[in-house]
Swiss-Prot record:
Similarity annotation: Belongs to the S1FA transcription factor family.
Position of sequence motif Nuclear localization signal: 50-55
Organism: Oryza sativa subsp. japonica
Single GO biological process annotation from the record: regulation of DNA-templated transcription
MF term (GO), any: DNA binding
Bias (Basic residues) ranges: 52-66
Function: DNA-binding protein that specifically recognizes a negative element (S1F) within the RPS1 promoter.
Protein name, as recorded: DNA-binding protein S1FA1
Pfam families, per the entry: S1FA
Any one of the GO CC terms: nucleus
Keyword set, alphabetical order: DNA-binding, Nucleus, Repressor, Transcription, Transcription regulation
Primary gene name: S1FA1
Keyword Acetylation attached: no
Length: 76
């Protein structure tokens, strides 16, 4: 390309990384580290924590379930 003074405009070759690329790499790296860390904590918790206790089923719910199945509830 030539401008008005007949000088050639030389496009500079971009050496190094684009700032947008650097930001993208940093964000992607942080996301990957976050998910890997969460997975590691999850696996550690699965090995070390005792299993969760189930909530006790209320007598009212037991009675309702037995009535649905056709079995008479005790005391009736």
């Amino acid at each position: 390309m030539a401008d008005q003074s007949n000088n050639m405009i030389i496009e500079e070759v971009n050496k190094g990384l684009n700032p947008g690329t650097i930001v993208l790499l940093v964000v992607a790296t942080l996301l990957i580290l976050f998910f890997v860390g969460n997975y590691a904590l999850y696996m550690y918790a699965q090995k070390t924590l005792p299993p969760r206790k189930k909530k006790p089923v209320s007598k009212k719910k037991l009675k309702r379930e037995k009535l649905k199945q056709g079995v008479s509830a005790p005391g009736e």
